[in-house]
Regions:
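The C-terminal output helix
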Residues: 131-137
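Intrinsic disorder at enzyme termini
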Residues: 1-2
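Nucleotide donor/acceptor-binding cores
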Residues: 10
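A glycine- and charged-residue-rich anion-binding loop/surface
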Residues: 18
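Cofactor-cradling patches in redox/metallo enzymes
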Residues: 26-131
Length: 137
């Protein structure tokens, strides 16, 4: 038995929220997480916050990973947090990635997002965060 065998298998919903069609990054991250033993549910492109939260609750995930490159992060991610609160699902952790300025990332963290991954973040950093970090956040 390895150390990984004694850890919980995390369930993470990944999604592209809004009208952004740039999905290569979220697919690469989703596959890397899956290959690292994380159960990944990829919701797909052009998801609304309502669709993401509904899927997250139905799939009983531990976390939502949101990818945004459209500049709508300060509208869409807070909406996801609001909907989670309305549905009494604040135990679902939210993290994000994409082109998100550092000032906005700090503001999103104040609102409850546990981490924002920017361009150039290594896949191993994201895997380590999911396997070890987000439940401690």
């Amino acid at each position: 038995m390895t150390a990984r065998d004694t850890q919980k298998q995390w369930r993470v919903l990944t999604a592209k929220v809004g009208l952004d069609g740039h999905d290569r990054g979220v697919k690469v991250v989703s596959r890397a997480l899956r290959d690292a033993g994380v159960e990944v549910i990829y919701a797909g492109l052009r998801q609304t916050p309502e669709m993401v939260v509904e899927a997250a609750i139905q799939e009983d995930v531990d976390a939502i990973g949101v990818s945004l490159h459209s500049g709508a992060h300060m509208t869409l991610i807070p909406r996801i947090l609001e909907l989670l609160k309305q549905r009494n699902a604040t135990d679902i952790v939210v993290f994000g990635g994409g082109i998100i300025p550092q000032d906005d990332a700090r503001e999103l963290k104040k609102l409850g997002v546990v981490e924002i991954f920017g361009p150039g973040t290594s896949l191993q950093s994201i895997i380590d965060f999911v396997n070890h970090g987000f439940k401690a956040a």
